[in-house]
Amino acid sequence: LLLNRPEKLNAFTFLMMEELISAFDAIEADDNLKAVIISGAGRAFCAGADLSSGKDTFNPSFDNFAVKQDDFRRDSGGILTLRMYKFLKPIIFACNGPAVGIGASMQLPGDIRIASEDARFGFVFNNRGIVPDACSSWFLPKIVGISKALDLTFSGRIIESKEALDISLISSIHKPENLIDDAIKIAQELIEKSAPISIAITRQMLWRSFGQSDPYDAHVIESKAIDSRGASDDAKEGVNSFLEKRPAKFKNLISSDMPDFFPWWDDNA
């Protein structure tokens, strides 16, 4: 997926949110697509929210596209990242340039985040008189730790790829001309030897473990998943292929063969 408003440094709009969510829906429904890579067109990944409305950019009374729920207007960045959170396939962000505001926070639900040498990251919300968006107050501390998350959000300072790597915001730095090819290689490593349904369940198990209060909660889900997967054709193929020293050919499909207990969480998004 390519954020494709290079003339605006891929500034984020409600339409971009809708198109990204539609793309995630389509990719998830297509069993031939095993992972998604997201990058930006041109020299930026995403320069943040489109500020063409000037001082009224963040004023809810000027938001003609608001999605409202109960007594609040839902943040469009959060609607997007919650869709990513529920996604059933690996998400890789290949950050090709500056990523500011929502450009930085939208990457946090990614399973792997890599960046070019030209990338920069800035959680600049407090500098604009607002607060972190896109569920980043939940994601960011879990990725970089609470003290570093507060440092980045209080100050709004822009960090380069090297510091992003040092604090585990990204996992690797790449030459700009190699970024997408390297992201594809990483995606292939993630998916080529593993069963798609096992990846889907594992992704949700690990991300949702942050909301569990006791390891017993994880034990319950793992037990159900092991029983379900252990009786599947994929498990038989996994064992047989190992014993026969050949690559596995997993046939169970996300579109039709997810276990009965899935999803196990209350969906309030």
Feature locations, PLM:
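Terminal peptide-recognition signature
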Residues: 1, 5, 19-20, 38, ...
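Conserved CoA-thioester-binding segment of acyl-CoA-metabolizing enzymes
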Residues: 1-41, 57, 260-269
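C-terminal long alpha-helix characteristic of the crotonase
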Residues: 6, 114-119, 170-221, 227-237, ...
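Hydrophobic alpha-helical membrane-association signature
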Residues: 16-19, 76, 222
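Glycine- (often His-adjacent) and acidic-residue-rich active-site loop
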Residues: 32, 40-83, 99, 129, ...
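Crotonase-fold acyl-CoA enzyme core
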Residues: 82-197, 232, 246
